[in-house]
Amino acid sequence: MQRNVRRRILSWLLLGSVLLGALTGCGAQAQSEVSSAAVLPEANSVANILERDGYLEGIWFPWLTHDDLGHGFTANETMVKYVGNAWSTVGIDKYGDQYLLEQIYNLKALGFNIMGYEGSIYAEGVIFDENGDVVGIKEDYLQNTRRFLDLCREAEMPVLWTVCCHSTSAVSYYNLEVWYRMTQMYAVKEVADHYVERFVKPLCAVLAEYPDVVVMCAATSEVENEMNDPDMGNFTEERETYGVPRESMLYFVNAVADALAQELPDVDRTLCGSTDNMTIYSETNLTYLGHQEYNADSRADDIANFRSPLPMLITEFGLGDGKYPSEEELVNAQLRFRDNFRAKDWSGWFMWCWSSHSSGSSYDLIAKNGGLTDFRKVAYALHDYIENYRAAYRGETIAVNTPTMFFNKGNGTVEWIKPTQSHTYRLERSVNGGAWTVLTTGGATVDAVGRKYTYQDTTLPAEGTVQYRVIVTAGDATASASSNRVNILQPAVNLVQNHGFENDLAGWTLFGNNGTYRVTNATAHTGAYSLELDYGSVEWQGVYQPSVQVKPNTTYTLTYYYKYAADATAKNAYCFIRGGNGTINVTDVIGQAYMNNGNTDGWEQETISFRTNSDAVCIDFRVVVGSHVYIDDVELCEMQ
């Protein structure tokens, strides 16, 4: 288990400036440079955050994943499984510590000062017997919980941890008999007691090891009927779900809340639930009453009229929630929503999902369980929202218009999200802590939306640590020189033979002969040649490189560039990383990417992070019907 992740990251976000560290994932260790104002105290709390920042701006980490690094998470592969890994092969061991660390720093760069994590929202880690009784907690769940919290400590990100489930949607993949069995803890007091003694308390013992990280825990106020069984109601007007009466559910929630108060007396407690249920839980052993607000644009008036004897916290905030409003409607909904809950002096909110129209503008599909999420689009909308919020409620007219920098996707690749206003800039570099020198004043490329800037530094030094920062120079009246920085380490040796295809197909092997699979000089990302894969009439043929030597049980990153040909009728190209003995083994895929974002105008970068299960891997590029794609600059390096 990787307990002590080495500090390689540079930064922390201060609410007046964005300071972000980043790295390629390959190479030597970077020096830490963390602001003392942001370092987590030995015993942290919500009160510390409120005193420092004045407000909680949180996000539920499991539902905000991205496709920008080529992971392509789906509903059953979201990071909610990162620790629990209850019924999915996707988890912390597959994607590695570095991926999570990158995610946390990216969220901090967007302005969030606390992160929610649903540690057992779907009963992850719970051991049931054949009758549905709770008999224990999984040891690997406890180990991965420590591993997760070690990384949160490394990134200095406080956490709200959900310690009990309120939904069993995963059992919708089973039959009703199994489904009912897994809900006994809500209905039977003896099973609820066993859940507290055999799961909650052992988990609390681990959470207690992180008083600087775990500042709040959450129980639940409802169980969702995600089976859509017409005979089962939701825990609202009829006061029952799964046939569980209000009294039984209240017993379960209070048992969990009481255990939290006993085992973690210095950690605040809240609920995650809906308005309909909150009044019946005001007697629970809580320090904050949590409120869940979906369709916030249409129900904003409801929360303004809500009353509670406890401090209020919006624990699940979903704006849009599957609807596709116009940008104007989205902005108006934001303002109305904030005006209402701020007027009642609520302590903060945790973003759950954010949906808007998918026309390719700066607002697009963002975070929701199910489907893919493009983190670049996430960055645009969240960045803009935070700008608007700070301008309206904090008067931070300087900080709001700074760029947001992100982890680079490859060696020497620097990326940032520009402010909403037009600007000119200069990109500066510092080597080994030396003087800042100008790299470019306009040489970065811009994506189709016009928000993400990318610059490729081709003059990396032979060794040492390299820092970058972007400074707004003109065109934005409220912006000043930013302190945004991104840190890049000297890369390790690329493990891919003939990675740029400059030596024909040396090191690569053809798989099938139906179609065109060759090296061509028709186009190239760098150099003179690239790999061309043109579908014929037989699917799943292509080119692979077998037996690439790696370390077992180690996280690696594969990066490459691709571009579709003008005559491609579909974007159906794939890259597979196969473990085992490093050969074509269809049952041993340990990493993959679906190349569906490419176009004919420029090259698209793809990155796959994966964890090895042996001492060799196979890199496999395939096409299916309609695909005609070019591949270049394939790079494999170890995340250290």
What are these regions (language model features)?
Residues 45-286:
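Active-site mouth of glycoside hydrolases
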Residues 150, 501, 531, 542-573, ...:
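Extra-cytoplasmic beta-strand recognition segments
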Residues 313-394:
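Substrate-binding cleft of secreted/luminal carbohydrate-active enzymes
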Residues 393-420, 479-490:
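Pro/Thr/Ser/Gly-rich low-complexity, intrinsically disordered linker/stalk tracts
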Residues 490-512, 640:
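Extracellular carbohydrate-recognition regions
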Residues 502-534, 538:
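Extracellular glycan-recognition surfaces and repeat-rich motifs
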Residues 540, 602, 622-638:
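Extracellular carbohydrate recognition
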Residues 584-616:
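Extracellular carbohydrate recognition and processing domains
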